[in-house]
Amino acid sequence: MAERGFLVLAFDPSYTGESGGEPRYVASPDINTEDFCAAVDYLATRDEVDENRIGILGICGFGGFALNAAAIDTRIKATVASTMYDMSRVTAKGYFDKMDTDARYELRRQLNAQRTEDYKNGTYALAGGVADPLPEDAPQFVKDYHTYYKTPRGYHKRSLNSNGGWNKTSSLPFINMPILAYSNEIRSAVLLIHGEKAHSRYFSEDAFKTLQGPNKELLIIPGATHVDLYDNPEAIPFDKLEQFYKEYLK
């Protein structure tokens, strides 16, 4: 998007990568939403930025956080969520909403036991990134993640999914704190993008049903998988992104 004339700020989430903060490798429905709002704080004070023409873009889990940020931050005028996950939903209910009450209770029990162990040890246990080697019965979307995160295609030494993953206990708040509770009150423009063959497509489709008003759009990319929208230039609709931002950041 920078090559198309936009002033772009890319950031590592709080407590990860080149961003500061302790403890490291924490995920949070609140903090990771605030990451976008903090980016808007910074941009709005830059001389070269028109504070009334700020948009955001989130990918995968941060697509959901971007949508949540749009619900809370009225300074955001246009939001793109690409191949999004609702991390609170998938954590609390499992993939395709298959987790029942007993399974959710067991998850809470395990995570709270881990909290005690972490406190005793003085360190946070990591959940692990993408499995390597893959089990033979791994679902196709997990194989796709492996192809991205565990190969030169997407591997980075600071990528949590490529390495040790997030803190295990980071999952706890996502179980109890749904991030998209007020997405129906978003008044700014929203573009949801998802691959036709993505296992996660239902997140965008359901989010779109909740959004109100005429300035909301769901774009399904024919034949694309979830990770195609990470880095595949043949699948990522750059022309549409440019058109969307130019229309709503006038």
Regions found by a protein language model. Name each.
Residues 47-61:
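Alpha/beta-hydrolase fold nucleophile elbow
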Residues 43, 63-74, 207:
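Short glycine-enriched nucleophile-adjacent loop
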Residues 211-227:
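Catalytic histidine neighborhood in serine/cysteine hydrolases
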Residues 1-20:
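Conserved alpha/beta-hydrolase
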